[in-house]
């Protein structure tokens, strides 16, 4: 009995230590300090993007933020949610028939792969078109295939965002083309991406740099798709070897937007930058932030449930639920400043 009590106390003490160490990060989320103030106090590099965040992909810990709760237009990083929901709720082997709305409902000057009304394409190929070439008509068609209509899919997007804790996100379409009522934040996009990365299939689609769509019923030529995220291309000046995937976005109203994730030194980080003058700035900002965190932080596992017997872990968890509102913590990872 005494041994169990000691285990309970130890569990609680380590959990409280973890929570207390995370408090400054939570405070930083809502800070109104200017970017220059934040950079001056933390030593992080100066960045140009209006909003940014670095989040630990395992724990959700915020390591860096700049205006991360300020609403921004997301542009095509919207497609992270679209792809994730398609994988979660759709049939990758199903055949999509392009509707008139999907083909002609988009701005033809925006990103597309020239799919035509009545053309048939697999759900899998449509996802590659979305994640590599940012094909707007493919995103619309995926929405119709999964939910029966664009409107139903958008409702699913918003319901999912809300369930993930996104408080400043509202979607009106599946592709991110500009709409004044289509917005999110860097923080919310990090939450959405963290959830998407729990899907192995999503990670596989997002990590591809090249894909071929075979001839269809209305097109005799193979479509060659290449990755639009230049941090993943070895021949690019922005190539970042640790980058495992991501999604770019740009509209005149949104500016440059980018979500990327990278893994190095046993750390997996999500970086979101929004409101940049161009995508080149997204790349340089993201690389600078990644380099700083990977060079100055390390991931420390504080404890795991298996280190305590079930009775002790359950009792301690109930205490944390009552006093801190914490859900099951399981294995806790903390990114620690090495300096």
Stretches found by the model and what they are:
Residues 6-7, 66, 79, 247:
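A general lysine-centric signal
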């Amino acid at each position: 009995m005494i041994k169990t009590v000691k285990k309970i106390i130890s569990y609680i003490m380590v959990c409280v230590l973890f929570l207390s160490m995370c408090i400054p990060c939570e405070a930083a989320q809502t800070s109104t300090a200017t970017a220059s103030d934040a950079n001056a106090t933390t030593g992080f590099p100066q960045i140009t993007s209006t909003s940014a965040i670095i989040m630990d992909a395992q724990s959700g810990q915020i390591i860096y933020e700049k205006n991360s709760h300020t609403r921004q237009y997301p542009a095509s990083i919207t497609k992270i949610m679209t792809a994730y929901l398609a994988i979660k709720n759709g049939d990758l082997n199903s055949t999509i028939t392009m509707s008139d709305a999907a083909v002609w409902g988009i701005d033809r000057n925006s990103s597309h792969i020239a799919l035509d009304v009545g053309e048939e394409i697999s759900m899998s190929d449509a996802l590659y078109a979305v994640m590599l070439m940012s094909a707007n008509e493919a995103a619309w068609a995926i929405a119709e295939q999964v939910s029966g209509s664009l409107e139903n899919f958008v409702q699913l997007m918003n319901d999912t965002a809300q369930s993930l804790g996104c408080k400043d996100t509202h979607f009106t379409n599946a592709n991110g083309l500009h709409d004044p009522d289509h917005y999110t934040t860097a923080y919310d996009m990090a939450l959405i991406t963290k959830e998407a990365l729990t899907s192995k299939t999503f990670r596989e689609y997002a990590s591809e740099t090249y894909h071929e769509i075979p001839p269809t019923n209305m097109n005799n030529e193979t479509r060659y798709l290449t990755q639009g995220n230049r941090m993943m291309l070895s021949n690019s000046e922005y190539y970042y070897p640790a980058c495992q995937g991501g999604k770019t976005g740009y509209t005149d109203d949104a500016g440059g937007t980018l979500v990327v994730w990278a893994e190095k030194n046993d750390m997996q980080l999500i970086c979101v930058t929004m409101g940049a003058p161009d995508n080149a700035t997204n790349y340089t900002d993201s690389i600078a932030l990644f380099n700083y965190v990977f060079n100055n932080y390390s991931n420390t596992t504080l404890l795991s449930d298996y280190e305590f017997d079930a009775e002790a872990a359950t009792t301690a968890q109930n205490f944390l639920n009552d006093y801190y509102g914490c859900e099951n913590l399981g294995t806790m990872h903390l990114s620690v400043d090495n300096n």
